[in-house]
Amino acid sequence: MGITVRNLHKRFGEFAALDDVSLDFPAGELVALLGPSGCGKTTLLRVIAGLEHADSGQVVLQGLDVASVGARERQVGFVFQHYALFRHMTVFENVAFGLRVKPRRERPSEAAIRAKVHELLSLVQLDWLAQRYPSELSGGQRQRIALARALAVEPKVLLLDEPFGALDAKVRKELRGWLRRLHDDLHISTIFVTHDQEEALEVADRIVVLNHGRVEQVGSPQAVYDHPRSAFVYEFLGAANRLDGTVSGNGFVAHGAAQAIAVDADFAGPARAYVRPHDLELAAPYARAQGIAADVRRVVRLGGSVRVELAARSGEVLEAELDRNAWRALALDVGDALTAVPRAVRVFPAR
């Protein structure tokens, strides 16, 4: 089922949680709502679910405006960050709960409920835990049970509020892949909230970047990462080096630098340039005409890669990331001088 929201506004006192938000969520897509704390992503999810009501605007499900319809009538499944399982119920009873509390005329038979629960527990690969209690499960297992419970009532839309936020990094990474595979099997329209850029880039079909209650950008993970429309999106979607300077006909000239860097810009004047650490090439001093003179300040070895912190002569602190073989070939150490050459630079007007 597709979802459309139009001109949503929601305030909490003086704080604008949603400021004229309009979005389309096509049927069958897995969409990430991504942004920093307080950007409005959870409020938007709760408004779609019917757990929160917008001050104005429309929420359209299956062609009907449901802005004034309660959560129960919207046929959405909601999974919270902190599981919300019933502690006094077994895994089986938790998953069966939504089916057993349906009105009598809609409630399946007990045999149908048992079959459905076992089907869902098999789907989340936890059928062997049916008679356990939540306190006997790991965090990752609890979250999968919470997802099975949400799916039991066959929702038209699945809404996930930072579903892996309370889990450790290793379990989060495993569950991200599992969620993507599950979605590929079920093709249920899914919207999930996250502040984890890597999670959104890895799992989602599309990403909606929010900031201060407004939509900054919508697009595929690759499009949003490679072609950010604003400095905010560039900085939020991963590690970024920032250089202040000026754009002219010759390119971008960083403050304190002698040489211009070739850039694709449709404006001139004060600017901020951004380059990813993996797009900052390191070379011997004066080896390149287009480059930034810097000194090695710190070296951090991260498994197969090396992160190099640089002190630019212009005063900025930069970060480069390269593989161990490339770093070894440079034969540099802390305190050594070098030239940092940006390979891919994005510039935005300075504000």
Curated annotation (Swiss-Prot):
Sites where the protein binds ATP: 35-42
PROSITE patterns: ABC_TRANSPORTER_1 (PS00211), ABC_TRANSPORTER_2 (PS50893), CYSA (PS51237)
A molecular function GO annotation: ATP binding
One GO CC term, this protein: ATP-binding cassette (ABC) transporter complex
Entry-linked InterPro entries: AAA+_ATPase, ABC_SmlMolc_Importer, ABC_transporter-like_ATP-bd, ABC_transporter-like_CS, Mo/tungstate-bd_C_term_dom, P-loop_NTPase, Sulph_transpt1, TOBE-like
Any Pfam family the entry gives: TOBE_3
SUPFAM superfamilies per record: MOP-like (SSF50331), P-loop containing nucleoside triphosphate hydrolases (SSF52540)
Recorded topology in the membrane: Peripheral membrane protein
Domain ABC transporter: 3-237
Catalytic activity annotation: sulfate(out) + ATP + H2O = sulfate(in) + ADP + phosphate + H(+); thiosulfate(out) + ATP + H2O = thiosulfate(in) + ADP + phosphate + H(+)
Catalytic activity, EC: 7.3.2.3
Subcellular location: Cell inner membrane
Stored CDD domains: ABC_CysA_sulfate_importer
UniProt keywords, alphabetically: ATP-binding, Cell inner membrane, Cell membrane, Membrane, Nucleotide-binding, Sulfate transport, Translocase, Transport
Assembly: The complex is composed of two ATP-binding proteins (CysA), two transmembrane proteins (CysT and CysW) and a solute-binding protein (CysP).
Family: Belongs to the ABC transporter superfamily. Sulfate/tungstate importer (TC 3.A.1.6) family.
Known role: Part of the ABC transporter complex CysAWTP involved in sulfate/thiosulfate import. Responsible for energy coupling to the transport system.
The name this protein goes by in its record: Sulfate/thiosulfate import ATP-binding protein CysA
Gene source species: Burkholderia pseudomallei (strain K96243)
